[in-house]
Every structure is written in structure tokens, then in C-alpha cells.
């Protein structure tokens, strides 16, 4: 069984996906971490993130490995754990550029499709493009302000600046991030984490 949980940036996808995976006793897979890892490695190599061929060649020379765990994924490049650096502001600013490249999306999709089910897959287009035949699909959303307030609780940054960055990110991600026609859309704004997890588990159990 594959459960897909897509949604806009900072809508709670990672926390919800991890909670659902733990409740079901299956791994949780974060596609976004692969895009973030590609962005981090590109930045460290001083590559132009808009140059997809060079970036892809660099990634193939430094193969990435996603370690899917219910409590949170880790991404490795050889023996180096990239995970601690994946949520810095520079990566936030560049990841949409990387994710917009069809070649990079195809590369990430191939990594994900090689993983054996069952698992919970979290991302932007898991239910529409990567696993269109998944039997359980969900899409999380919330207003930019609510998402900014949540993110500011995790990082010492100004709420208004975070909100502006999220609105810009939403525009960049619009082509990739849309709910599948058969996905259940959940507004996480008025709900707590456990309530969202409970709604998804209830839907899966029906």
C-alpha cells in the first residue's frame, strides 16, 4: 500500500506523514528532502541552479541515498549525512528552481519508484505524477499567514518575511503542486497535528 500526502510548503506535510507512517507501522518517504539535497550540493559546488544539465551531472557523480524512517528521513551522500543542512534559508530560496527542472524531477521520481512499498510518500506531486495509482491520496493546505506563524516557531525569523517567502514559493511551485482529482483536501489551518493525522487514518480505515 502507498499513501500519498501532498501539499503546499509548510502545510505540515512532514509531521503529518511521519505520524501517519508511525501509526500504520510503515516507512515514511520525503521526496522534498531529495530536492533539498540536490539544492544543497549545487550551492556548495557554486553551480548555477538554473543549469539543469550541470547540476544533474554533479548529482550523478555524488549519488544520494534516501533513508526512509517513520520518525524522519535522512539523506546521505556517501558517508556524509546531509540532513542537518537541508532546511537552511539558502536551500529554501533555491529549491523551487531545482524542482522546476523536468530532468531533476524525473531523477527524483526514479529514486522514489525504486523503493518497495508499503510506505507513506510526502511531497508536491506524489499523488498526481509519481504514484498516480496509489489507493489513498491526501493534499494539505493552509493560509500563508498560518504557515508562516508555524515556521517562525521553528526558526528565529520574522513572520512577515517568512509569509512573503511562502507566497513567492507557492507561485513557483504552482505547476508542480496541485491536488490529484481523487485526493482528499484537508485545510490544516484550524486543526492540530493529531487531528489531521486522525482524519487521514480514519479515511484510510474506511
Curated annotation (Swiss-Prot):
Output the HAMAP family linked to this UniProt entry: Cytidyl_kinase_type1
The chemistry this enzyme catalyses reads:
CMP + ATP = CDP + ADP; dCMP + ATP = dCDP + ADP
Determine if Transferase is one of this entry's keywords. Answer: yes
- This chain belongs to the protein called Cytidylate kinase
- Its EC number is 2.7.4.25
Please give the Gene Ontology molecular function terms for this protein: (d)CMP kinase activity; ATP binding; CMP kinase activity; dCMP kinase activity
The record's keywords, sorted A to Z, are: ATP-binding, Cytoplasm, Kinase, Nucleotide-binding, Transferase
Q: Which GO terms describe its biological process?
A: nucleobase-containing small molecule interconversion; pyrimidine nucleotide metabolic process
Superkingdom as given in the UniProt entry: Bacteria
Enzyme kind, highest EC tier: transferase
Q: Show the GO cellular component annotation of the record.
A: cytosol
Similarity remark: Belongs to the cytidylate kinase family. Type 1 subfamily.
The encoding gene is: cmk
User: Where does the protein end up?
Assistant: Cytoplasm
Q: InterPro entries annotated for this entry?
A: Cytidylate_kin, Cytidylate_kinase_dom, P-loop_NTPase
Q: Which annotated residues bind ATP?
A: 7-15
